[in-house]
From Swiss-Prot:
Protein name per the record: Sulfotransferase 6B1
GO MF, any single term: sulfotransferase activity
EC class of the enzyme, as a word: transferase
Catalytic activity: thyroxine + 3'-phosphoadenylyl sulfate = thyroxine sulfate + adenosine 3',5'-bisphosphate + H(+)
Active-site residues, Swiss-Prot/TrEMBL: 112
Function recorded in the entry: Sulfotransferase that utilizes 3'-phospho-5'-adenylyl sulfate (PAPS) as sulfonate donor to catalyze the sulfate conjugation of a variety of xenobiotic and endogenous compounds, including dopamine, T3 (triiodo-L-thyronine), T4 (thyroxine), flavonoids, isoflavonoids, and other phenolic compounds.
One record GO biological process: cellular response to xenobiotic stimulus
Homology family: Belongs to the sulfotransferase 1 family.
This protein's encoding gene: sult6b1
Record field: temperature dependence: Thermostable between 20-43 degrees Celsius.
EC number assigned by the record: 2.8.2.-, 2.8.2.n2
SUPFAM superfamilies attached to this UniProt entry: P-loop containing nucleoside triphosphate hydrolases
pH dependence per the UniProt record: Optimum pH is 7-9.
GO cellular component: cytoplasm; cytosol
Amino acid sequence: MSQMKSRMETAAKMKDEDKLYRRDGILYSTVLSPPETLDKLKDLQAREDDLILVAYPKCGFNWMVAVLRKIINASTGKDEKPPERPPLVEFLPPTVQEEMAQMPPPRLLGTHLHPDNMPATFFTKKPKILVVFRNPKDTVVSYYHFMNKNPVLPNAESWDKFFSDFMTGDVSWGSYFDHALAWEKRIDDPNVMIVMYEDLKQNLPEGVKKISEFFSLPLTDEQVSSIAGQSTFSAMVENSQKSHGNFGSIFFRKGEVGDWKNHFSEAQSKQMDELYHSKLAGTKLAARMNYDLYCQ
């Protein structure tokens, strides 16, 4: 994690107000996603055999990176050590983006970006795209703790302030609901598969099987079972020191469903319910999300 470590050390010396900047109305990390990095993304050439992983922040991205790497290794018979940097394209400096062209397939590329801000070839080249969503109440709680543990991002002043910013979309990578509505438009695209964090927590073996089939990476039942066993959240936390070094505790906290109940006031819960229903009621994504089960 040496590159990430040096970036975090740079950020630790910065004032909180300098850690984010606004681009086209959306906040991004000054250290991880400077303008030249996002500018260069316009030239990134996806391939049809790329594996693309997308998630709004704190919806299970790092968990699914680990699962996908295990699926790739098991299916291809390789045992590759994961690279030191997370596969988020918006974190890759321009020189690294250019080196990506030389990477052998299958390449695992990830992003927290809104679909409108992704490299155009993510859609024109028709690679398979896995999108992970999580209920908004647990997402905002996880995001709040992440802000307070990650030196690259400014500290959240308070839970109430961060909740308010999340509700208006004034957080890094933009509005959760804007992301959700953008993927709702693509929910029937055969190259897009949307999975729910809560469903994966409920039945990880089934999730591993569906994901491997979607990416045409066949696994035996034994491999599915083994990958699921190694990828429970508790196993990931245990292994996080090895996989993420000192940053393991930043990326993996509780991973629970329902932790929002320890943070939300009754008024905040009602406010989120109203916003959720005004934005997503009647959508196909809402039908998958099972909001009433996980957020009441």
